[in-house]
Amino acid sequence: MAEGKAMSEFLPFSRPAMGVEELAAVKEVLESGWITTGPKNQALEQAFCQLTGNQHAIAVSSATAGMHITLMALKIGKGDEVITPSLTWVSTLNMISLLGATPVMVDVDRDTLMVTPEAIESAITPRTKAIIPVHYAGAPADIDAIRAIGERYGIAVIEDAAHAVGTYYKGRHIGAKGTAIFSFHAIKNITCAEGGLIVTDNENLARQLRMLKFHGLGVDAYDRQTWGRAPQAEVLTPGYKYNLTDINAAIALTQLVKLEHLNTRRREIAQQYQQALAALPFQPLSLPAWPHVHAWHLFIIRVDEQRCGISRDALMEALKERGIGTGLHFRAAHTQKYYRERFPTLSLPNTEWNSERICSLPLFPDMTTADADHVITALQQLAGQ
C-alpha cells in the first residue's frame, strides 16, 4: 500500500502488517496437531541461518529471554561487569542485574545514537565480561570495530539486533558472525506477536542455549529424528521454559518471506519524512558513515524546544490531538528510578540530551503516502509554535 487515502481513524505509531498468508500459516499449524515447538521452529532457525549467513540459530519466546540465557551461558554473574548503552530497552539492564552483575552504561554518539568503540573501550575494566552494542532504529553500529575490541581484550560481544532484521553492515546481514539477538515483538520489522531468535557461530554456546531455553534438558523441545522429545532426555543444568511455539514460528516465517517488501515500504516512508524535514526544525538522526542498508525500524526526530518552539512532550500531545500516535525509544535507563538510585552520579550527556528530545514518528508498512503526508502537515503546523 503506497498511495491511497489517509486512515480515517487514529494513525498509530506502529501496526503489524498481517494478511491472509499469516492466517493460513496459523491454520496449517493448528490443523497439524503439533502446535508447540516443532517443525516450524526448525524451519525458522534454518531461514535465519540463510538470512544472516551464521551457523546456528535458536528460536526463543522473546529477545529478552534470548538475552537472559545468552548471559547465563557466558556465566556472567556476581562481580562481573557488562558494558551497554543506557539508551536501550531496559530488559538488557534488567537481565544483567538479575544475574547479579553490574551494567556499565556508556554514552552514545549524539546524532546517530550508536554506542561508539571509544566509549566501550574506555569503560573496560578487569571485571568486564561482555559488551552489548545496540543496532539502533534499524541502522548498524560499527560492529567490526567493536568486535575487534572484544577480541583484543578477550571479552564476549552480544549484538542487540532487536531493531535489525533486514539491516546490513558492509554488505553482510547483521548477525553474520559472532552472536546476535533478534526480536519478533509486535512493532518489529517482522513479528509473530512475541518471539525472538539468537544466531551464533559458537557451537558450544548454541548447545548451551538450547539446553537453557528448555528446562536444561539435553535436547530441544522437538527432535526431527524421533518426532517428539527423546525419551532419555534428562536435566543437564537448571534451565527455563523459553521455547517458541510453532504457531508463533509459522507467523514469523510468513513475515520473513515478506521482509524485502515490508522494509522497502518502510524505506519509502522514511524518505518521504526525510525530504519534508529538510525544511523543518525537527532533527532526524544522522546515518552511520560506514556502508550499510538501513532497515528503518524507527524514524526518530529530536525536538529541541529552543530550536523548534515546542517541547517534545507538547509535540507528542499535539500530534495525539490530531489523531497521530508517537513513540519514545528510549527513556535513558540510567534516569529511571531503580538505575538512578543505583548509579546516582552517572552522567551521559549525549544520551541525556537525546532522551529528553527524541520522538518516534509513525512508521509501518501499511501506512499510505497520505498517512505520511498527514504527519508531515501536522509537523509543519506545529513547527515554531
Curated annotation (Swiss-Prot):
GO CC terms, sorted: cytoplasm; membrane
Single Gene Ontology BP annotation: lipopolysaccharide biosynthetic process
E.C. numbers: 2.6.1.87
Catalytic activity: UDP-4-amino-4-deoxy-beta-L-arabinose + 2-oxoglutarate = UDP-beta-L-threo-pentopyranos-4-ulose + L-glutamate
SUPFAM superfamilies cross-referenced by the UniProt entry: PLP-dependent transferases
Residues carrying N6-(pyridoxal phosphate)lysine: K188
Molecular function (Gene Ontology), one example: pyridoxal phosphate binding
Cited Pfam families: DegT_DnrJ_EryC1
Induction behaviour: Induced by BasR.
Pathway linked to the protein: Nucleotide-sugar biosynthesis; UDP-4-deoxy-4-formamido-beta-L-arabinose biosynthesis; UDP-4-deoxy-4-formamido-beta-L-arabinose from UDP-alpha-D-glucuronate: step 2/3; Bacterial outer membrane biogenesis; lipopolysaccharide biosynthesis
Enzyme class: transferase
CDD domains referenced in this protein's UniProt entry, alphabetically: AHBA_syn (cd00616)
Cofactor(s) the protein needs: pyridoxal 5'-phosphate
Keywords: Aminotransferase, Antibiotic resistance, Lipid A biosynthesis, Lipid biosynthesis, Lipid metabolism, Lipopolysaccharide biosynthesis, Pyridoxal phosphate, Transferase
Family membership: Belongs to the DegT/DnrJ/EryC1 family. ArnB subfamily.
Stored HAMAP family: ArnB_transfer (MF_01167)
SUBUNIT field: Homodimer.
Described purpose of this protein according to its UniProt entry: Catalyzes the conversion of UDP-4-keto-arabinose (UDP-Ara4O) to UDP-4-amino-4-deoxy-L-arabinose (UDP-L-Ara4N). The modified arabinose is attached to lipid A and is required for resistance to polymyxin and cationic antimicrobial peptides.
Protein name: UDP-4-amino-4-deoxy-L-arabinose--oxoglutarate aminotransferase
Taxonomic path: Bacteria, Pseudomonadati, Pseudomonadota, Gammaproteobacteria, Enterobacterales
